[in-house]
Amino acid sequence: MTVLQTTRKEAGLKGVRIFESVVKAVIWRFAREFRRIASPLSSKRRKPTRANGNAAFPNRIFIAGCARSGTTLTQRLMGCFADTFVHPPEARHAMLNMLDRPESNLVVKRASRSYAHLAKLPASTGLIYCVRHPFDVLTSSHPQTRALRRFHVTAERWLAEYDALLQLKKAQPDRQVLYVRYEDMVGEPDVVQDRIARSFGLAPRIRFSEDPANPIRKTSLRKWERNAEFLTYLSSLPPAFLARVERFCGEFGYDMPANPGDKVANRLAP
């Protein structure tokens, strides 16, 4: 046998061994996944706390809403429920299908541009939508953007978020949405917790108001009413945009001054 023939034979044997190892790895992984799914313990762990038609699937909950509307606070407080995993990073709703967790309830908070895909949220995914008085949202700053602009949420961003919500309601008219007002979360956190618990079949582990890791502060409410700079900025927004804001306020029970500039004049008056 020549050296070339020997080399070819060795290469062939090596290729066969590699192929066999790959096949064994695939079979092992398939068997492991099958045992995990078929295991009574796995089924017990994944049994949701509410009837969703299939005990093998967890209870998936997506938190959406414009930035500075309480989405982060709501995300953190969801950890107050028992048997609940809260995914720490912001992510698209598709992340809910990628999580492999033993908890019965999975929670993901939207990423900054998730509003673009909100209308495609699966019907099987529960939705908590956070809202806040638009004037508070539009005059709130954020450490990540403070060096770039005075206020974190631009009028364009706020409008895109609201339009995305309207598109969702049009695309899925029968969808159940749990709206959480920031003002209610701060003012009556335990009442809001009870609403969330009833809506998704969750069991409180600790009361929202007693969570030491997430103290709730009321100082961020309606700051725009007490700040001439904020009122001046709000009065400079285009009338067409303010008309959309007024519609939002009417929908979610917020009052809106006819002209924010009038409050500026009143504050500056002797």
Segments predicted by a language model, with ranges:
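PAPS-dependent sulfotransferases, especially Golgi type II membrane carbohydrate sulfotransferases
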Residues: 2-60, 142, 198, 202-270
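Flexible, charged surface loops at secondary-structure boundaries
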Residues: 55-57, 97-104, 121-123
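Residue-level preference for the first positions of well-ordered beta-strands
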Residues: 60-62, 104-109, 177-178
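Glycine-rich phosphate-binding P-loop
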Residues: 63-75
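Hydrophobic residues on the short alpha-helix immediately C-terminal to a glycine-rich phosphate/catalytic loop
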Residues: 77-78, 196
